[in-house]
Amino acid sequence: MNNRDKRVLVGMSGGIDSSATCIMLQEQGYEVVGVTMRTWDVPSRFSTPGQDEPDDVLEARALAERLGIEHHVADVRKEFKQIIVKHFIDEYMQGRTPNPCVLCNPLFKERILCEWADQTNCAHISTGHYCRLEERKGKLYIVAGDDQTKDQSYFLWKLPQEILQRFLFPLGTYTKQEVREYLRQKGFEAKARGGESMEICFIEGDYRNFLRSQCPDIDTQVGPGWFVNSKGVKIGQHKGFPYYTIGQRKGLEIALGHPAYVLRINAEKNTVMLGDAEELKAEYMLVEDYHITEMQDLLQCKDLSVRIRYRSKPIPCQVLVLDEKQLLVRFLSEASAIAPGQSAVFYEGKRVLGGAFIASQRGIRKIAADNQDKF
């Protein structure tokens, strides 16, 4: 093992998980190099007047100094806004429900980690994700972490093999509580007591307020529209389609005498379709832009399931290839609130076989009827 093979670049957020990752890798004999990505500025609790560095940079640097490791800061704010934040806004403006972490991890953060790893002569990269890697027939697969409440395999389905080959995931066999206890044992009591990070790093609070802050003319550009029922009949006014998501029940501000849910969003007509819980259910789902490690494994899997949003339970399913861009998914148990823009991630047990983005479900009944005998 040459010097490069012993070097690992860790994405350091200054939080619990990346801190534990650095310490564990050091104990395993690796020469750890840290990099903190400055993606989006949030109000700092620690910086002094005249110093504009955010908390994650300050905390990561302090940890690096204590561990005696090399530390860098990658200022990627401009690129992050142009790629990740723009995509987030664009998706909502098309009536879709994005998950920015799915795009950010493979197409942004891990790419930057690889670039910095090359610059710092590191063979490996690592993060504090709660997941593992497993090799099968010469291919690497993401495997869900042992802590089901913190498992982050859902976000990583788009990672290509060339990046997976460089990855180390030391937290995959730990629970969050075990990681906290590990830090205490190593003398990092304050770090062990740290809080959880925000689910979307660039949004504090309601995403609707964020949309307004980034698109000041959104309310005049879009304006109020109509709530309609499943027959297309207007039943009330809404504030504008970007402010609603599939499956939403709270905050609709409409009295129908019964619980109502968002069934569909039509950005072109600025309409939001409402219905009951039964109408929200689906037997089939159309997905697009898929990335599958081995298609035959997916099609022949006898224990295939799909997660249609983060933290949702896996749903048993079957998959049919429609063309090079689209798959048709048949659910084998109840599924509801199919939200275009979200990720559909396929599992065999805890192993990720691949994923895709949930497409518009317009015409799904005809597509399903034309193909139901092909499963």
Swiss-Prot record:
Described by its record, this protein's role is as follows: Catalyzes the 2-thiolation of uridine at the wobble position (U34) of tRNA, leading to the formation of s(2)U34.
Source species taxonomy? Bacteria, Pseudomonadati, Bacteroidota, Bacteroidia, Bacteroidales
Name of the coding gene: mnmA3
Where does the record place a coiled coil? none
Annotated region described as Interaction with tRNA, given as residue ranges: 150-152, 309-310
**Active-site residues annotated for this sequence:** C104 (nucleophile), C201 (cysteine persulfide intermediate)
Name the SUPFAM superfamilies on file.
Adenine nucleotide alpha hydrolases-like
- Where on the tree of life does the source sit, at the highest rank? Bacteria
Q: Which HAMAP family match?
A: tRNA_thiouridyl_MnmA (MF_00144)
EC top class, in one word? transferase
Give the protein's recorded name. Answer: tRNA-specific 2-thiouridylase MnmA 3
Summarize where ATP binds, as residue positions.
G11, M12, S13, G14, G15, I16, D17, S18, M37, G128
EC number of this enzyme? 2.8.1.13
A Pfam family it matches: tRNA_Me_trans_C
Q: Which UniProt keywords apply?
A: ATP-binding, Cytoplasm, Disulfide bond, Nucleotide-binding, RNA-binding, Transferase, tRNA processing, tRNA-binding
